Regions:
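Conserved beta-strand elements of beta-rich interaction domains across eukaryotes
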Residues: 52-53, 68-70, 191, 216-217, ...
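Conserved hydrophobic "DFG−1" position in protein kinase catalytic cores
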Residues: 47-50, 214, 263
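Long acidic, serine-enriched intrinsically disordered low-complexity regions
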Residues: 115-143
């Protein structure tokens, strides 16, 4: 595989993890990986064959693991060096020495401070791997910040991945009424233990994840290849309808991409769209009022992220018509543009 060394997520491998259904039933499950969805970005996504009859979890399902070690795009975006076993050894010692717990507390305190200064930067943390390129920036910042070690990087990533996992689980809970139709069914949450010598707790090493209904189909980006031209308009409109439905249920998706829609044949000569990937979402209750919510809806433009992109891609095969709700947002927030 093209991933970092010792990646366990390869076709044919068998993995073991704890499973908890939305109804609260729990069991230990073993699953065989039968397909890997590459490249890994924020999470490691694989198709597994489940055989957990005690919970009724049998057959092919999607397992999405929030594993910091193999979050290759996230590491690249955050300028964090690729994972190695040597880094893991350093991280384990950091955990045993109590450094990880202290660092997570520090991160949360800084995050709370950033939340209070809501108009400041989002609190993205600078990593010093490219130290020469960051000299000017560091001169302008508080000089008390220390260079992060590899163990600190891993602690930050673990904490960040846990937040992404919690967000995605909460989104699925909030969208329960459209599970199995417009989004996959959330079948269970999972936890995979990563033991190490001297370990007393898995708080900083265990890998959380979710088990999802497998939707067999093709990404919206490939609609030209798999669907007849006369169906493109309806398929793209269905994707936009799902965006509106999710918005109506109080979700703001900061990562709407056309590849995050799966299209499958529903009935003869018809297609159904399903949306996936909700780790980078916000919730209505996170915003002060309707004005604040609408402003960020306008900035994010979830509808346009599909409509404009697919209109350009399909070159006349799909005509995007701005919806009334987004025309209203444009009128209110984009007058100056």
């Amino acid at each position: 595989m093209a991933h970092e060394p010792e990646c366990p997520y390869a076709a044919g491998n068998v993995i073991k993890f704890h499973v908890k259904t939305p109804g609260g039933l729990e069991a230990t499950a073993v699953a065989e990986i039968i397909k890997v969805f590459e490249p890994f970005t924020l999470s490691s996504v694989v198709l597994v064959r489940m055989a957990c009859s005690s919970l009724g979890l049998e057959g092919n399902m999607v397992l999405k693991l929030f594993d910091r070690r193999f979050a290759t795009q996230l590491r690249r975006d955050e300028k964090i060096r690729p994972w190695t076993p040597e880094i893991e050894t350093e991280y384990y010692q950091f955990i045993l020495d109590g450094g990880a717990a202290e660092f997570v507390t520090q991160l949360k305190e800084e995050e709370d401070s950033d939340d209070e200064a809501s108009d400041d930067e989002d609190g993205d943390y600078e990593h010093s791997e490219d130290e020469d390129n960051d000299d000017e920036a560091s001169d302008d910042e508080d000089s008390g910040d220390e260079e992060w070690s590899a163990a600190m990087d891993e602690t930050y990533l673990h904490n960040h991945m846990l937040d992404l996992y919690k967000t995605e689980v909460q989104v699925y809970s909030n969208l329960k009424e459209i599970q199995g139709t417009d989004i996959p069914k959330l079948l269970a949450s999972t936890l995979m233990s990563i033991p190490f010598p001297g370990q007393t707790s898995g708080d900083y090493t265990d890998v959380p994840g979710i088990l999802l209904q497998y939707i067999e189909g093709f990404p919206l980006t490939d609609v030209e290849q798999y669907a007849p031209r006369e169906s493109w308009q309806a398929i793209c409109e269905d994707a936009i309808r799902i965006i509106h439905r999710i918005s109506d249920l109080g979700i703001l998706n900061e990562d709407v991409k056309t590849r995050n829609f799966i299209v499958r044949e529903d009935t003869e000569n018809a297609f159904k769209v399903t949306m996936i990937d909700f780790a980078l979402c916000k919730f209505r209750q996170d915003y002060q009022d309707d004005y604040d919510w609408d402003k960020w809806k306008s900035i994010q433009d979830e509808e346009g992220a599909v409509g404009y992109v697919m209109q350009r891609r399909l070159k006349g095969g799909f005509s995007y018509c701005r919806s009334a709700r987004y025309e209203k947002l444009d009128e209110e927030f984009r007058k100056a543009e």
